[in-house]
Amino acid sequence: MRSPLMILAVLCVFFCAAAAGSSVTAEEKLVPGSQVACEVKVKSGGKDVTMRYWRFVPKGYNGKKSFPLMLFLHGAGERGDNLEVVKKWGPPKLVRKRKDFPFVVISPQCPRGTWWKVEGLYQLVNHVAGSLRIDRQRMYVTGLSMGGFGSWHLMDRYPKLFAAGVPICGGGKADSAKNLVGIPIWAFHGDADGVVKADLSRVMIKEIEKAGGKKARLTLYPGVGHNSWSRAYANEDVYKWLLSHKSGGGKTGGGRK
């Protein structure tokens, strides 16, 4: 007769192995045309942080052809630990019906009470680009409200990371314009936005142009308040415009100090 300790040891080995196996499956198993919850360890503010995110892989992905990548950054209202709320707006909402959406979409969640940390986002992009067949010359960033600010900041900090960006109802630092002159940017804002003033987008485009940039543009929606993202993300021309841009090699190493 086996001792209780031996039985306990065998059970521990079995369940630990099963748990490890399920973890690997959740992260590595790909179901084209679906959006799955994932997580990755990143360094942020000198600490190890677990970043949770949605990962959408389009129908037709088979690991042979490289696909464009889109990073989506949500607004302040979707922060927290309930990943489902990230699918409320934008690309993660869109792909629930658009199984053939022509991008791999990654939609991380920002913890409650914090703001987007670009170092962690940079690591997330590199993690996904290194684990899937991603066209590194076609990586894009977009976000709304707080995510619009995050998009501007990320492009400023890592100007060679993305081929183009679509910041919506956000804003950046005017003195960062010199770092953005080479990036195609299509910003959107409602001119009646009472939460994030449209002047924040106007100033960024103006400063980029003053610095010599010719690739930035702004669409203002007359009479529209803070929610300019519903119109922007419903515009098919946005996705065609993104796909029309390629970076000069998709270099992801190192950012601006």
Where do the protein language model's features map onto the residues?
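A domain-start/cap signature at the N-terminus of enzymes
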Residues: 21-69, 142-144, 149, 154, ...
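Gly/Ser-rich "nucleophile elbow"/oxyanion-hole loop immediately N-terminal to the catalytic nucleophile
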Residues: 60-65, 113-146, 159
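Primarily recognizes the serine-hydrolase "nucleophile elbow" in alpha/beta-hydrolase
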Residues: 130-131, 137-181
